[in-house]
Amino acid sequence: MIKNYWKKFWKNSTTKSQNFIELNDIAYGNLKRVKVGIEAYRENVIVYRCINLIAQSAGHVPWKVLKSRTGEVISELPVHYLLKRPNPEKAGVDFFSELIASKLLFGNSYILSTLDSYPKEIYLLPALATELVIEHDNLVAYRYKSSKGDRIYKIDHIAKMSRVLHLKNYHPLDQHYGLSCLEAASLPIDLHQQSFYWNHSLLQNGARPSGALIVKDSNGYLSDEQFERLQAQLSEKFSGNSNAGKPLLLEEGLGWQEMSINPKDMDFIESKNSAAREIALAFGVPPQLLGINGDNTYSNMQEARLALWEETLIPLLDKIADSVSNWFSYLFKEDIIIDFDRDSISALTEKRENLWAKISNANFMTLNEKRAFVGLPPIINGDRL
């Protein structure tokens, strides 16, 4: 019966076909086009992990308000409660985690104050729904687009007041908007996704590479009718994950020749890991913390976590603290210094203890100088050596 089926393709014909069956498209389908943007956060596990690791780690660090002159911590000011409970919808941890995630994803974050001065609540404006209003190359307002209509928040340049604080990454080609980390990592993200789709399609095909049917008889040609019928039969019976591993019975005169490069030779796993390392580099995350095989830049995980805090998270929190301090100083009409509590960061514990031991043993500093160095208030008779 199989012989009779294949003999249907070998009828005499005066028309020779020179068409090609694109077996790659049959076996694998069209590769999905990678969209570098917010889709990368949803679809790429490395991007998702990097952003969540940075946002959640930095977002959990407590904030504190200091006196501008003495550096003493103040816990009774309205600013302190505002940082701890920004609004009824979000606690401080969620608020700052989302702020940092938006800054990484879009290059921009926007904080809205409920009042022009002495605000009771602060909110985050979605980066995709917020625009800068530029007139004569000067920023004059912020426009927030919502389902209820646009809202304009003007900037008072005379009083140096703005209800919106714009936090942005440095962008060499745009003075108004920040540069997203996803743009810098666009090529590694694309490579990582393509490697994933290749492996996924290979698994759907039963880990069998594509190939070609070679006609050994009839001068190596098929008629148009034979070509179309053979193409339809191959597509229906022998391609796709449901037909993976199904044996292909060939009549005399037909042969199967593998055409794809051996996946082992192409080493897609290593290229995927290399792309993952470059993505982590763009976000400032040590690849070792992501569990990438073969990456042991640091001797242990503690050193990798310390590098993450010192090289990425602390500079990020310093920048946020400076921006929020400056903004609140104008809103509350007093000099306010906002800082984050470095003593609460567990990754810095060992380094902090070594520093305290050196300060304690320093015989050229007074007791109050030592206390001021670690953020403690002075005591009576503490200025003597």
From Swiss-Prot:
Belongs to the phage portal family. HK97 subfamily. InterPro entries: Phage/GTA_portal, Portal_HK97. This is Uncharacterized protein RF_0471.
